Amino acid sequence: MSKRLLLAGMIACCLAMPVVILAADKPPKKGASVKAVKAMSVQEQTALALSAAPPHISKDAGVMVFGEDGKLTEARKSANGFTCIPTVMNLPAPDPMCMDAAVQQWVTDLTNNAPKPTNTVPGIAYMARGGSHFEKGGQVVMSGEGAKNVSEPPHWMLMWPFDAAGTKLPIAPNPSGVYIMFEGTPYAHLMVYQDPRKMK
């Protein structure tokens, strides 16, 4: 499964390093570039990656970090089916994500421009530091061309083909904290604006 995460960087160990963990708990530096994340040590990248998930997930999760060649490589094997990476879009700050095997497949399919995701079960992904998405004309879109970048709060995702017509769920961020991202595409999925760090 780790090979699937060598997917163009998805742009798309720290249990023995408490000092590094504390550093990763600080707010991410605004304007940080992917290059800056890649320049971090393995320990720093590991701490950043693991900060994406609830403690009961991150403690046994695998970790992928950027190597000297700029590609993601396995730094720690997963003992619970989840794998964490130090950043995704990095706009405007590091946005680590921790995902299960189904989401890894989903991401691989998206990166490879597959017609639709091929995961056969719903996938779960955590982004406890928040992230960002593109909006154009008041709608969340997949491409950044001509769109504005909008920051997102801490959240988790359910990668499964949700349909707004059938579920009656919103298709844009709203006060309820739940919406379908990429509605109308095969990659539609559920966004839940709930802080993973508060999950027990």
Feature names for model-found ranges:
Residues 19-23:
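Sec/Tat signal peptide C-region and signal peptidase I cleavage site
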Residues 26-200:
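Primary mode marks residue(s) on the alpha4-beta5-alpha5 output face of response regulator receiver
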Residues 1-10:
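Bacterial N-terminal signal peptides that target proteins for export
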Residues 9-18:
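Bacterial N-terminal signal peptides
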